[in-house]
Amino acid sequence: MESRVNENEQVQARDIAFLLFLTFLNVINYIDRQLIGVFANWIVPELDLSNFEFGLITGPIFIFFYAVMGLFMGIIADRVNRTRLIAFGLGLWSFLTVLSGAAKGFLSLALPRMFIGVGESTLAPAAISLLGDRFPAKWQGFVVGIFGMGVSIGLGLSLLIVAYLEPILGWRGCFYLLGGMGIVLALCMLLMRETPRRHLGEMQKENDISTNKGLLDGFSFRTVALDLRN
């Protein structure tokens, strides 16, 4: 039994690779989130937006849908295939980022940004749930810290994109590039297997224990209570 526990506590190279891949997706997530803000000096005059309109796009329109849908996505992540949920969200926000790059005015930019918030809200709850099942408890703080580094890295890279890629591609080209990259990564995510849920395995073990106990001791109140609880 002891060797089996130690075996379960071991972290393999593919687990680290999976963590780094999800962290990279988090980097892309935050680059995408910041891109419209850091390109304000180009977007506002070209689309003839007022400060109020641009404030709506970067503030309430995005944040409301991101915050509200984040709650629902956390619930959904507990019930569906999480790798596919991430792939769906990543594909959605990446496609809408491409549409944002083709915007001609307020509405054609506001509508994609609204649903980009929906797509981006899938990543954090599903990724943290996956990592929680993939790594042992003693690694949880480290794992979440690595995943969270994607926020700072993404913020920093968004500024570098403005400095070095905008003169070459323009703001629209940067949107197209990031969106296209995200679509490719979404397809890669679809190829990954779902990580078995740890709590389901523990529930199955408890069910097995209660069943064996019932066979040994007879059909007792304890067995009924355990079965009802599960």
Residue ranges of model-derived segments:
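Cytosolic juxtamembrane N-terminal segment immediately preceding the first transmembrane helix
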Residues: M1-I31, P45
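Residue-level signature of mid-helix packing/kink "hotspots" within the transmembrane helices
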Residues: Q34, I63-L71, S121, L155-G156
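Extracellular/periplasmic helix-loop-helix junction of adjacent transmembrane segments
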Residues: F39-V68
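Helix-breaking motifs and short loop linkers at transmembrane-helix boundaries and internal kinks
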Residues: D48, N81, A102-S108, P136
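Conserved MFS/SLC helix-loop-helix module at the cytosolic interface between two early adjacent transmembrane helices
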Residues: V68-K104
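Cytoplasmic helix-loop-helix junction between adjacent transmembrane helices
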Residues: P112-S152
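Helix-loop-helix hairpin linking two adjacent transmembrane segments in secondary transporters
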Residues: F147-E194
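Flexible cytoplasmic inter-helical loops of multi-pass small-molecule transporters
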Residues: R193-T223
